[in-house]
Design a protein with these regions (language model features):
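Alpha-helical transmembrane segments in inner-membrane proteins
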Residues: 1-349
């Protein structure tokens, strides 16, 4: 009887925990929807909630100007904020899980710096016959995948630990930042300014075509990652414990890195460098949802989506009418959070 009571208590606690987790996930989903509407409302020509809702759902009569503002200008940017936020959050979440390092993210592994270098080459030296709006994303994507290839090379080595992979990522970060600085130094002032603006990260480049590309790539990569959820959850117990459960760490490491690199490269190539999403969102999701990847992964996506969407709203109201880069807003929020992580780790030690 006593053992049955213990089992019943465990089951009840587990159900209570799952209800709490679903509540958190649904809460961030609601925040994302609200922030989407706010993002579409906000701009030089402020729209009311009713105007946005009527335009989005085709309710009543909507004048052509409002319809054009919503569908051709603001909605692609607002949806891009949600999708890119979710994409970068997944990348950061799985990199942190894989490397068991709270400071790890696609940004700190040098992928963002590589994208910046690739974009700067195209901006400074020409688009090689392609339209600039096509060539810049291609340059950023190619260079990000090159940096990822270097990480894959080291990750494929049997005795190469997660800590050493982080060090390789930091080395790549400094290498590509140095190359980027060199390109800016030898470029004309107006070209250097264009590079700098791209590096700030901006959702103003959003189009329906680029949005669809990111959605397709992210959906495929997340679907493939979802097949490895139990392995990634087990990995949080430690590499030795995961290996004892029959998990091939080398294969898992390469697979996760490939998928994260694809998502990150695609997102960054279209919107520029937007830092700290991949660092902040996973930590918030982990604090509220725990390490179970069934809840942690969708939770991180929703936190990242809401974070970037709200940052997009803030970027429009800081200087009304000005194109304030959203990457600056995320950095202002992310830097204090980064210090908080460092102090927390220090106390834990």
């Amino acid at each position: 009887m006593k053992s049955n009571s213990v089992v019943a208590d465990i089951v009840a606690n587990q159900r209570k925990l799952e209800r709490k987790r679903w509540f958190v996930i649904l809460s961030f989903l609601a925040i994302g929807v609200v922030s989407l509407i706010l993002d579409v409302m906000t701009g030089p020509a402020m729209l009311s909630v009713s105007e946005v809702v009527n335009a989005l759902f085709g309710i009543g009569e909507v004048d052509k100007m409002t319809d054009n503002i919503v569908y051709n200008l603001r909605l692609p940017m607002a949806l891009m904020a949600l999708v890119v936020g979710a994409t970068l959050a997944v990348g950061g979440a799985e990199i942190q899980t894989l490397l068991n390092n709270p400071m790890a993210s696609p940004y700190t592994l040098g992928l963002a710096a590589a994208a910046g270098f690739g974009a700067s080459i195209v901006i400074a030296f020409g688009s090689f016959g392609l339209p600039v709006q096509v060539a810049v994303p291609i340059g950023a994507f190619v260079m990000t995948m090159l940096a990822s290839g270097i990480l894959f090379l080291f990750a494929s080595k049997r005795r190469f630990s997660s800590e050493m992979l982080v060090l390789v990522g930091i080395a790549l970060l400094f290498i590509f930042q140095s190359l980027l600085s060199l390109v800016q130094f030898i470029s004309a002032p107006e070209v250097s300014q264009q590079i700098l603006f791209w590096l700030f990260g901006s959702l103003n480049k959003a189009t329906w075509q680029s949005l669809i590309i990111i959605i397709v790539v992210t959906t495929i990569c997340v679907a493939l990652l979802s097949k490895e959820l139990w392995k990634l959850t087990a990995l949080r117990l430690g590499e030795d414990r995961a290996a004892s459960l029959g998990i091939n760490l080398q294969v898992l490491r390469i697979k996760v890195l490939v998928l994260v690199a694809m998502m990150t490269a695609t997102a960054i190539s279209f919107v520029g460098v937007i830092g700290f999403i991949g660092l902040v969102a996973p930590h918030v999701a982990r604090m509220l949802l725990g390490e179970d990847q069934r809840f942690f992964l969708p939770g991180a996506m929703l936190v990242g989506a809401a974070f970037l969407s709200l940052s997009s709203v803030l970027s429009k109201v800081i200087i009304p009418g000005a194109l304030f880069p959203v990457g600056i807003v995320t950095s202002f929020i992310g830097v204090p959070f980064f210090f908080w992580i460092i102090l927390n780790n220090k106390r834990g030690q």
